[in-house]
A protein has these predicted regions:
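Intrinsically disordered, low-complexity terminal regions
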Residues: 1-239
Length: 239
C-alpha cells in the first residue's frame, strides 16, 4: 500500500513536467526541490534530459539503482541549472547502464548546454526571444525551438535534429557534427561548417555561408546568397 501511494504521489508531481497533462511514466523518478530560479541548463555525464516549458519550474531525477542518486547532482549556480554525475574518486563510465535521467520543467530558458554524451529531448516547444544551444562531444539534441534569434554550436560528433522557426539563425558546426534542420525555418542564416561536419537548413531570405575542410552546407527555401566562402573541400548546395 505504501509503495502504491508513493508511486501515485510521484506520478502526480511529475505531471508538472508536461506542457499539457501528459504523465511521465518512470517508476524510478524522484522529485527534487530547486534552490532558486534558472534561465539556463547544463547537462553532462551521459544523462538523458527531458524538457518541457510550462508555468512552473520543477525537477525530477531517475536512475536504475538508488546507489547512483547520491552522486547524481543537480544545482543552480548563477542562474544555471547544472545536471551531472559526480565521478570524483570512483570509476565511472557513462555507458547507459545507470540509466540516468532528468525531467525539467521551466518557465523561461535562454541557454542549453548538452555535453559528454548526454541527450536532450524537448516535449512540446521552447519559446524564447533569444536562445543559445550548445551541443558537443557525441551528445544529441532533438526538439522544436521558436526564437527571434537562435545561436547554435555543434561540435565533436554531436547531432542536432531541430524544428521550429527563427528570424535569425547563427549556426557553427565542426568536427564531424551534424545539424539536421530542414524543419527549422529561418529568415536569415549565418552558417559556418568545418572538419567533415554538416548543416541542413531551410532559409527564406538570406544566407551567409562558410564551408571548409570537407564541411557541407545544404539548404532549402527561397534565400538569396549574400556571401559564400569555401575552401579545402567544403561545399554549399541548394537542394
Amino acid at each position: 500500500m505504501k509503495k502504491l501511494l508513493c508511486s501515485l504521489i510521484t506520478v502526480l508531481a511529475l505531471t508538472a513536467f508536461a506542457q499539457d497533462t501528459n504523465v511521465i511514466n518512470d517508476a524510478n523518478a524522484t522529485v527534487r526541490s530547486l534552490s532558486g530560479s534558472f534561465t539556463a541548463i547544463s547537462v553532462s555525464s551521459g544523462i538523458d534530459l527531458y524538457l518541457s516549458q510550462g508555468n512552473e519550474e520543477s525537477l525530477a531525477v531517475s536512475a536504475a539503482d538508488q546507489k547512483y542518486l547520491d552522486r547524481f547532482k543537480t544545482e543552480i549556480v548563477n542562474g544555471t541549472l547544472k545536471i551531472y554525475y559526480d565521478n570524483k574518486g570512483v570509476t565511472w563510465k557513462s555507458d547507459g547502464k545507470a540509466k540516468l535521467k532528468a525531467y525539467v520543467s521551466f518557465k523561461t530558458l535562454q541557454k542549453l548546454n548538452v555535453s559528454a554524451g548526454s541527450d536532450a529531448i524537448i516535449n512540446g516547444s521552447i519559446n524564447a526571444d533569444d536562445f543559445n544551444l550548445d551541443v558537443s562531444s557525441g551528445s544529441v539534441f532533438k526538439g522544436d525551438i521558436n526564437a527571434k534569434t537562435l545561436t547554435v554550436d555543434v561540435s565533436s560528433g554531436a547531432s542536432i535534429n531541430i524544428s521550429g522557426k527563427s528570424e535569425k539563425l547563427k549556426v557553427d558546426v565542426s568536427s564531424g557534427a551534424d545539424f539536421k534542420g530542414y524543419d527549422l525555418v529561418t529568415d536569415y542564416c549565418d552558417a559556418t561548417v568545418s572538419s567533415g561536419a554538416g548543416v541542413h537548413v531551410t532559409i527564406n531570405k538570406e544566407l551567409n555561408a562558410k564551408a571548409s575542410s570537407g564541411g557541407d552546407i545544404h539548404y532549402k527555401g527561397t534565400a538569396l546568397i549574400r556571401d559564400i566562402k569555401t575552401s579545402s573541400g567544403g561545399s554549399v548546395k541548394k537542394v
